[in-house]
Amino acid sequence: MVRARRGCGCPLNQGACHRHCKSIGRRGGYCAGFLKQTCTCYRN
């Protein structure tokens, strides 16, 4: 997993986080961590 910095849509726009992760070659992403402020990308 890869964590992106803030500003990738979290916590209010999880879709933006997902799109960011796809744009860097990952399979997708979601908002995680404290108050869902961190965009976490996944491969599988």
UniProtKB/Swiss-Prot annotation:
Major place of localization? secreted
Any single biological process term in GO: defense response to Gram-negative bacterium
Range of residues in the leader sequence: none
PROSITE patterns to which the protein is assigned, alphabetical: INVERT_DEFENSINS
Q: Which residues form a coiled coil?
A: none
| Cystine pairings recorded for this chain | 10-31, 17-39, 21-41
* SUPFAM superfamilies linked: Scorpion toxin-like
Q: Would the keyword Secreted be found if you checked this record's keyword annotation?
A: yes
Q: Which superkingdom heads the taxonomic lineage of this protein's source? A: Eukaryota
Where is the protein found, in the record's own terms?
Secreted
Q: Name one GO cellular component term.
A: extracellular region
Which InterPro entries does its entry note?
Defensin_invertebrate/fungal (IPR001542), Scorpion_toxin-like_sf (IPR036574)
Q: Which UniProt keywords apply?
A: Antibiotic, Antimicrobial, Defensin, Disulfide bond, Immunity, Innate immunity, Secreted
Record function comment: Antibacterial peptide mostly active against Gram-positive bacteria.
Family in the record? Belongs to the invertebrate defensin family. Type 2 subfamily.
- The protein's name: Defensin
Q: Which organism is it from?
A: Ornithodoros coriaceus
Q: What is the lineage of its organism?
A: Eukaryota, Metazoa, Ecdysozoa, Arthropoda, Chelicerata
